[in-house]
Amino acid sequence: MKRFKQILFIASALLGGSLFTACSDDNDTPVFPEKEEVTYDMSGFARGADVSWLTEMESSGYKFYTAEEKEQECMSLLRDLGMNAIRLRVWVNPENDTDDVRGWCNKGDVLLKAWRAHNLGYRIMIDFHYSDRWADPSQQAKPQAWADYSVEQLKQAIADHTKDVLSALKEKGIDVEWVQVGNETHQGMLFPTG
């Protein structure tokens, strides 16, 4: 029960922290430190968390702590609490958003978080929103750059974007176990076309 409360606290902190976000800088190229060779047993049942806002939260000064009040890097802390899978959302051009996402969760940001998760032995899910911002039941807007595309052009853009992100991950040696196509798409996606 104590472990569940710790996981619930961390998940709540991540979710709550996403409500108080800041802007990213204009640099879209992540820096990848040397990979440390460490092996973790992350097999079996998937126990995961969506940490898509992590880099933005860290940029805003958020810190994460153990139950003993010792500061610890978030993904490492989640792993120590029993997590073995990470979900990361990817948007097409979040720089086009005028509200709250402004550059976070683009390909470079996702690569950086996936690289960190990979080095900790996490199983990784990539969630393609196929939008410049949140995609959920109330909004499934096409990316601004795709707004006037025909159905054929849209199909090609989806394929190209998906291949681009997954190829970039593969190039860094990052294995993706799951790919989620769209987010909360039970009413469709890529509106008004889809």
Show which residues each predicted segment covers:
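Bacterial Sec-dependent N-terminal signal peptides
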Residues: G16-T39
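Hydrophobic alpha-helical targeting segments used for export or membrane insertion
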Residues: L8-G17
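Residues in and immediately flanking transmembrane alpha helices
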Residues: S18-L19, K63, D100, Q140
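Substrate-binding cleft and catalytic face of glycoside hydrolase catalytic domains
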Residues: L77-G194
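Boundary/entry segment of secreted carbohydrate-active catalytic domains
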Residues: F32-L77
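Bacterial N-terminal signal peptides that target proteins for export
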Residues: M1-F9
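Conserved long hydrophobic alpha-helices within structured protein cores
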Residues: A11, A46, L81-A85
